[in-house]
Amino acid sequence: MSNQHTLLMSNLLPVGSNISTWWNFGSMLLTCLMLQITTGFFLAIHYTANINLAFSSVIHITRDVPYGWIMQNLHAISASMFFICIYIHIARGLYYGLYLNKEVWLSGTALLITLMATAFFGYVLPWGQMSFWAATVITNLLTAIPYLGTMLTTWLWGGFSINDPTLTRFFALHFILPFAIMALSSIHIILLHNEGSNNPLGTNSDIDKIPFHPYHSYKDMLMFTSMITLLFITLSFSPDLLNYPENFSKANPLVTPQHIKPEWYFLFAYGILRSIPNKLGGALALLMSVMILTTVPFTHTSYTRSMMFRPLSQILFWTLMATFITITWTASKPVEPPFISISQTTSIFYFSFFITIPLLGWTENKIMMMNN
């Protein structure tokens, strides 16, 4: 048995001693997933996937089922927590150059897409006014696909409009996809431990490793406890903090809301979609807003893995973070000036990051060579 295997057996999992709190979000995501599956199971027991009964069944869960309000609110709030954690997890990966572990990064991107699909299907299930119209707008984008669009939309809807078959299949998909997320998470973790975690410096950790337990496991437990505390504070004092008032009304196909918007965690992609006044162009931009993450491992040009010692890249990274927040904010506003122009400008900035960062990598290489 090699020394590496002996080390693995004796220490369970050797990890770099200098990994920071930003490395705790993976375990927090796993906690969120377990929480979602558990609460989702209990909600599914009482939920009815029928357009005439779905809205009433959600009210029945919150009013009549013992502790049903806790299950329902916990499921909704921890979905938001899930996305907060995953966005921080992705930002950490971009900042510290973790995308260079290509298999892990690409499996993570697949996980993000599956999670977004799951959350979208779940948002439709209460059959509130915003649920119905968000589903109508987003699924209608499939019609932009040449030749196959109309057929795909009809197949997804189960008819010529969003109706009972649509809700049934959305419920089935929302139930089955978390298990796909579990499978993908397992692959993600296996691929990660094949090479091992990176560290903030972006250097090889082999010379300075410590056992994962108890050193890093206690750090994970601290973050886990903090997250659960925040979750229950929100649940107890502001359970409807992230809900839209429009969704407390039953879906009515005859009344269009003044401003259609999905949940806050989709607003960045929705803002990019809305900024392009063309259906096919908007649909492609929406798809690319997530798929562009897959290009990052192949466009890395810097000699240094992490952005920790690259001040120019740091400025660009924090510009991306500000852009992400601004797109989210503008997408929550009506389609009117000045929000249209702000949304279009920030969408250009968002995609510019992925084009500019390789060029900036080359520039930084030249500067370093000049200094040497």
From Swiss-Prot:
Q: Write out the GO cellular component annotations.
A: mitochondrial inner membrane; respiratory chain complex III
Q: What membrane topology is given?
A: Multi-pass membrane protein
Keywords from the UniProt entry: Electron transport, Heme, Iron, Membrane, Metal-binding, Mitochondrion, Mitochondrion inner membrane, Respiratory chain, Transmembrane, Transmembrane helix, Transport, Ubiquinone
Q: List required co-factors.
A: heme b
Protein name, entry field: Cytochrome b
| Remarks, miscellaneous | Heme 1 (or BL or b562) is low-potential and absorbs at about 562 nm, and heme 2 (or BH or b566) is high-potential and absorbs at about 566 nm.
| Subunit structure and binding partners | The cytochrome bc1 complex contains 3 respiratory subunits (MT-CYB, CYC1 and UQCRFS1), 2 core proteins (UQCRC1 and UQCRC2) and probably 6 low-molecular weight proteins.
The record's similarity note reads: Belongs to the cytochrome b family.
Highest taxon of the lineage:
Eukaryota
> What organism is recorded for this protein?
Naja annulata annulata (Banded water cobra)
Could you tell me which PANTHER family the record lists for this protein?
CYTOCHROME B
One example of the protein's molecular function in GO is: metal ion binding
Binding locations of heme b b562: 75, 174
